[in-house]
Regions:
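Hydrophobic, small-residue-rich alpha-helical packing segments that form membrane-like cores
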Residues: 1-5
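Well-ordered alpha-helical scaffold segments within catalytic/enzyme domains
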Residues: 6-20, 55-68, 212-216
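Surface-exposed beta-strand/loop patches in extracellular or lumenal glycoproteins
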Residues: 213-228
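Solvent-exposed beta-strand/loop surfaces of large extracellular or lumenal domains
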Residues: 231-256, 273-279
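C-terminal beta-rich recognition modules with glycine/proline-rich loops and embedded aromatic residues
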Residues: 27, 72-84, 88, 92-208, ...
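Hydrophobic core segments within long, regular secondary-structure runs in both alpha-
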Residues: 8, 12, 21-35, 57, ...
């Protein structure tokens, strides 16, 4: 499945470089077909989302920048939920009994290649020698080959390719986060981020609030309005002073912003529930397996309400208000706080 995504993404890239309208239209059609097998939160039929999502994110960027900015919405959901949540943050997530199950049993492949011992009292990384017990510590921060509904660390599920593709997804979003224009800059994603143009601070999913602090006087700032922001109730305020702001299409345009000015975009952020189709590959064909109800706040998944595994992923425990200062996002200067 990942190979299909890779080839298709290159087709879109070629169409964009050659200005081939027919090829681009065909590429868009393929993208929409492939993404129809992916849940709104980014779970893929092949359950290898770190890789497949990265290619879909890349192709969606081509579409967002050329034909339809609404594709930024899809990118945001995939990165915010699947890519970020596949990170292996703590070795406490490793479950020995599940790791034991995830082995080659007879002729059946279950997660793990190779000839491993009958028990996993000793981790199967014997080439680390005396440091074998330290493997889990060294693995923290990597990314898992994992479905969104579970988060189990078994041998071979934490892979270099998963980590590399996840980091590439983050890089693509960071690269497109703030884009310079002749009059100022555009903001396409709504994360906490900082570069030479501005500092961005997101309060989601706790509060409908997004703040920008320009690094210099800026004639025009355009901020993309996600589908879940109510344009009629969107308010823009600044401290100190005032700014001119109006809605133009799917962007709010802010003019004459001053260096160091805190510009706040305020909007209602309500919970809602969707029902997502979950596909799996059967003889290399995506087949509908089940439906799952998903609770969202904005573009952030708060809970999966159905079909969690025996070892459900530790979804958003790190997003509790106890994990941030005073109910506000932690500011990490010069870095992205996902």
């Amino acid at each position: 499945m990942y190979g299909v995504f890779t080839v298709y993404q290159e087709v879109l890239r070629a169409a964009r470089l050659t200005q081939d309208a027919a090829l681009f239209a065909r590429g868009k059609q393929i993208h929409d077909r492939l993404s129809s097998y992916v849940t709104g939160y980014g779970a893929t039929p092949c359950t290898e989302p770190a890789c497949s999502n990265m290619e879909l994110i890349y192709s969606a960027i081509h579409l967002a920048e050329t034909v339809d900015p609404s594709y930024y919405e899809q990118i945001d959901r995939y990165v915010r939920n699947q890519t970020t949540e596949a990170q292996f943050r703590t070795k406490n997530e490793w479950k020995r009994e599940l790791a034991h199950e995830g082995r080659m049993t007879g002729g059946e492949f279950r997660w793990v290649f190779g000839e491993y011992p009958d028990t996993l009292d000793i981790l199967p990384y014997d080439y680390y020698g005396e440091d074998a017990d330290d493997v889990l510590d060294k693995s923290e921060g990597g990314f898992l080959w994992t479905d969104f509904s579970e988060h189990r660390f078994v041998p071979a599920s934490l892979m270099l390719c998963c980590s590399g593709h996840a980091m590439r997804s983050f890089h693509l979003v960071a690269e497109k986060m703030i884009r310079p224009t002749i009059r100022g800059f555009d903001v396409n994603f709504h994360y906490s981020f900082e570069n030479e143009y501005a500092e961005l601070i997101s309060y989601e999913p706790f509060e409908g609030k997004f703040m920008m602090i320009p690094k210099k006087d800026t004639q025009e700032i355009r901020v993309r309005i996600p589908a879940y922001w109510d344009k009629e109730q969107l308010r823009v305020c600044a401290e100190p002073g005032e700014v001119q702001a109006k809605t133009e299409g799917n962007y709010v345009v802010i003019r004459n912003a001053e260096k160091g000015q805190e510009i706040q975009l305020l909007y209602p952020l309500e919970s809602h529930i969707t029902e997502e189709n979950v596909f799996r590959l059967v003889d290399q064909v995506p087949c509908l397996q089940f439906k799952v109800r998903v609770e969202w706040r904005g573009n952030t998944v708060m809970r999966l309400l159905d079909h969690c595994s025996d070892n459900p992923k530790m979804i958003y425990k790190h997003r509790s208000k106890d994990a941030i200062y005073g109910g506000k996002p932690m500011k990490i200067s010069g870095r992205i706080h996902w």
